[in-house]
Amino acid sequence: MLKSVAVADTTISAQRDRLSWGVVELQVTDLDRAVAFWTSALGLIVRDTAAPGVALGTRVRTLIVLHPGAVVPVKAPFTGMYHLAIGMRSQAEFSRLLARLIQRNVPVAPTDHLMAKSLYLHDPDGLEIEITLETPERFSHFGDMSRGPRLYDVDGIVHSGRGPLDVRAELSHAAGADPMAPMAGDGYVAHLHFKVAALEPALNWFETLGFERHLTLDGWGFADMGAGAPNTHRLAMNTWAGPNRPPMPQDMAGLVHYELIAHGDLAATPHLRQDGDVRRGTDPAGVAVTLRTDI
């Protein structure tokens, strides 16, 4: 049972996010196998092969860089990345990727979070990937979350936020599209979900970077944060691996670095050091982070 709940204001605003995700860097056990999976399953294209990594993304931008160096696949009892979410800008593209995954025989879990539609899958090392279509316009308000997730849509219907998507209905939006086409150019890193040792210190840390608290479920060991609007699930964290877990070993597959882009002046934070035009540090999950501005 969920013991305590804190929910920030969930009013949807037209304000631009203060922060967005830049390039995400992952360490894998077999670089060639990983590149083959990410390109075949998701339709990412190779943008750069400068040693030692391979940059993958859309025709417009790099989303991830895969690095060799991991010796063992993902193991659960450590902090680090829980999953990486890649966002689609349209229902048609989301549905087309679902069709692609099915055609490629990739195991996938289509899930309706109400605020978003999501497709969950894993790469060969066990890294979890989420393909998401953000749908904040479907969400109205939270119910009594002390007894489990209860989300109300704009028609007043309650949802668990964890139900299955209607696959047939989703695929209808991809009718006539080529599932084997590359990912649309406007694909983007939608959010990162971390495994952390404790919620409160991690929430405090990310607040100094410009994120704001949204939903905190202490009894469920989960919290998420926004960065302005319209989506309030720009960063998530959990303690499901257990409290006070150590960071992932250096030889394990996982997230090794990510960029955050500030849309405006950089926030003053004691947790990152200045390095030329950027700020660098290590987050509460033990992952290297670079914060830069787009101005």
For the regions a protein language model found, what residue spans apply to each?
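Active-site/pore-lining binding-face segments in mid-to-C-terminal subdomains
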Residues: 110
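Short, small/polar residue-rich loop motifs at catalytic or cofactor-binding pockets
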Residues: 113-116, 274-276
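Glyoxalase I/VOC metalloenzyme domain signal
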Residues: 1-21, 25-48, 58-107, 122-214, ...
